[in-house]
Amino acid sequence: MHSRGIKTRTINHPVLQDGYQLIIKLKQRRWRCTNTDCLYESNEHFKLVNRYRRNTNASDLLILNQFRNLNCSAVDIARQFHTSDMHVLNVFDKYIQMDRLPLTDAISVDEVYLDMDKSCKYALVIQDFYTGDPIDIIHSRLDRVTEPYFSNIPLKERASVKYLISDMYNPYLSYVKKYFPNAVSVVDSFHVMQWLIHSLDMFLRNLQKEYKARDESTRCEIFSKYGHQHRINVSDEVYLLKKYRWLLLKNQEHLEYRLEPRYDRHFRYFINTFGYEEKFLALHPYIKVFRDLKEEYVRFNSRNAGNPLKASEEIDSLIHKYCSSEYHIFVQFGNLLRKYKNPIINSFIMVDRLGPDGIYNSRLSNGPIESLNRKAKDLKRLGRGFRNFEHMRNRFLFATRKNPIYKG
């Protein structure tokens, strides 16, 4: 072999993460066979870098590890490793293709709003309740998409599912009959309380509008009487309904009562939490009654954790009490409890779950998947939206699974 000279290659080796860039000047010799009948040519080979590459092989792993950080976009990663955003995307697509994880006996389903196009508005997220890892994300929650997806999963695997945790969206509840023959539906207790809190909040907002309309009427009367605009201070009722609605909406056990009075600029005197509570409850005769009825369900929800049989006995009396009341909000709430009675009772079942500090006993809940959905929304916001669902799916699953598998 005869040397045909040395070529200097400029190689990016982004191992420095302190703002500096490491450039390797690689001297590569080219050889030619001295046999005139052969004239075979070859370059020197280096394990550090492949042919035609301007980045070392180590950069691929560094780039992939950075893709697990949902706070970094492709542009941020490219800037960090002194390369182009197209290169880091090609590296990701080369090594990452996330497959669906096997179904476990407790899975959670929920939607996340992506709005990529008409066929991908609400994506369906499936999560392993025990580990918290996402099993898969499907580009739509519509039946024409989910039906072939679940039907293609082997029946033996689907039959192993015992609990399907979701909110009160009826298509999710129907999955049990359609696809999971041995499972029961579980309606997350958070969504039940959310429904009640939302109804109470709407009651307070409507009450606030009534007081605002009263104040506006007073202002108009003053204007018609004196012929000029007159500034009216915010009324006590509007002030309390705007600033202290949490006295009704928050669970009483979580309220922090302060004995030490503080100066209130609106009332122009010192007042503590008990004073605010007294004024707030006096705004409308229903407020105290609503709080007592709400707290009754809160206590029922707390004391029966891990005891679905006792919850099944107590919920009937609650339904009767709410439905026979004269308050429309709680009549509707009682009808809601009656409609989803069995799935709500199933939410009191407790199972062992893997957490950051090890295994612990937990109620069946959609709380973990709500946290997971937040990460998908953050990823979408950081990337200013996505057009390629498959890339978004791979990025999301790769970043949120504890031990993702690389391909290649």
Where are these regions (language model features)?
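RNase H-like nuclease fold core
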Residues: N90-Y163, M168-Y175
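Core catalytic machinery and nucleic-acid-binding channels of phosphodiester-processing enzymes
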Residues: K27, R79-N90, Q97, Y130, ...
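Short secondary-structure boundary/capping segments
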Residues: A123-I126, Y179-A183, L200-R205
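Short, conserved catalytic/metal-binding motifs centered on acidic residues
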Residues: C33, I77, I107-V112, L164-D167, ...
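Short, polar/flexible loop-turn hinges at active-site or ligand-entry regions and domain interfaces
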Residues: L48-N50, A159-V161, A183-V186, L207-K212
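Acidic/histidine-rich catalytic cores and adjacent linkers
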Residues: L64, F92, M116-K118, H139, ...
